[in-house]
Structure formats: C-alpha cells, structure tokens
C-alpha cells in the first residue's frame, strides 16, 4: 500500500530537508553481528521488528517476490501470504512472536494481516478502507495499529482490537498514520493539521493529541513509543531532519550523526530509553569537472546509529572492521540492548542483521 500523495510529499520534505532518558556508561558499547539469513533461493532480507526473546520479523526477497518471515531459534521461516500473490511484508512483532504487516491481493490492493500460532489472518477493514490497509504495530494485548487508504489520495490511522477496527481520524487535515503502540495502548504516528503541516500525535483513551514540534521546527513525526510513554521520531530543522525524543511533554532535538547533513530519524526506543535510528550522508565530490570530463561523486549513503552519551554514534564504528557488512539503518532495539538493523554485504546484497552487545 502506498502513502497518500500529499502525505508522501510532505514526509519526503521532512526526511530530505529534514538527553537520553537513562544514564549511560562513558565507554562506547561495541557489538557482535548476526546475519538473520533469508529463505532458500533468496539473497535479500529486510528487517521489520525485534522482541526481547530474540525473535525478529522481516521480509525475504529476490528479484520477483518478497515473503514475510519470522526469525526464531536461529532459523528464518516463511510466514506465508494470504494466497493471492507472492508478496507479503512484515512490519512489526510483539513479545509473543505475533507478526503484523500487509499483503497484496490479485487486484493489487494491500491488506493488513496478523500472523499468530502459525496462521496468517486477513484483518483488512474493507468497509472503512476500500482502497487498502497496512498494519504497522502490535502490542502484547494483540492490539494492532496501522493505516488505511480511504480514497485515491488520503490515509487514515486505525486501531484493530478484539476483531473491530476504528478509524482514529486526523489532527484536522486529510491524512494520518499510526505507526506504533505500547502495552498501555498508547498509539503514536503522524497526521496533517488543518494547515497541511505534518505533526506527530499521541492517541490515548479515545483522544488524538497533537504533539506539536519545537520552536523553529518545520514538522514532526513519531515512529516508536516505549512502555513508559517516551516517544522518538523526527523533526524538521533548518532544512534537514533531526532525530528527536518526546518525553514529559517536551521535545528534545537529538541532532544527527556527525557529517550526516541530509538528516536523521530515530526509529526505536526500548524501555531503558536507549535510542536507535538512521542518518544520511550527502554525496561527496571526488573529482571536479574539467574540460571533457564530468565531475565524479561518491554517492549519498545511510548509516544506522545508536545514541551513546548524548551523541548519535555510527554503528559501523562499533562492530568489527572486517565484518563484511555496512550498516545502513537501525529499525529497533529491544530491552536486552540488541539492535535490529539493515545492512549491505560486500556483494551489495541487502540483509537483516542483529547487533548483540559484547
């Protein structure tokens, strides 16, 4: 399922133009790396979510298909599809190993799904969202959040609980997306306001609260929330995006990784307040243009980060220099401090990996 056109454009602006709650040791934490693998015949895997039992949800892919997967007990298994196509994508996992995401029908409409006890169930609310839906988060009470496409352009956040789906509405604009939910049932995401600006929201006890943004920011988005209600995401600052923490009613600008001037976003926070995310470095001029020759650039690239001692630290500096992997993003951190990441291999294959503290 695709973002609504207007929401996607605004989020592209936030990303491209785009402290710590707990005390941390002054010594940088280093990590061991585990490749979560892919299904037989596939050479690509993408990470989605990680629980504190060491289970991870993701997607295994090749040139023509992608299948949602569950990594558990050292093995990766297919969790299948809803049957119409060979495309399914996991987005989140809870502490019981239940996985949510979306699948596609033969008519190319996305349907939210729940995978539980070895079975994938279609939870698409067709009456609310006839144009498609995607599940993005699940808590340990089996409450599921996501968004549905209500027409040709606009998405609305939803909550699925007890077999019933509720449209959560917006902050006054046309669009909203629910991206995460904690065990207290608090939901976070982002929505357009009546003026068309993207703002982070917190939905709790039937009410959507606008979390606003710090003074000088151009917008905000909330991507994750922990058990104590701390929220992470991004804010638009001075033509870039910065990773951000919202706690106790206050936004904290976490900045970006040194040199990553194209921006950063915080994607995960555990119950200890440890934060991870992704930052983007600009292209670098290698050879200036000269008569008969074009300028050469090192392409823009992304890295995963963890916040240590108040700074965003490139995770590539915290693993073995001969690992054979380049970490391109971190998508979540569990309560053991294990970090789920995306990475590329020496052969440029995308892989889901887990970093375990040494």
Where do the protein language model's features map onto the residues?
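Residue-level hotspots at or immediately adjacent to binding/recognition sites across diverse folds
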Residues: 4, 9-11, 24-358
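Bacterial N-terminal signal peptides
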Residues: 12-22
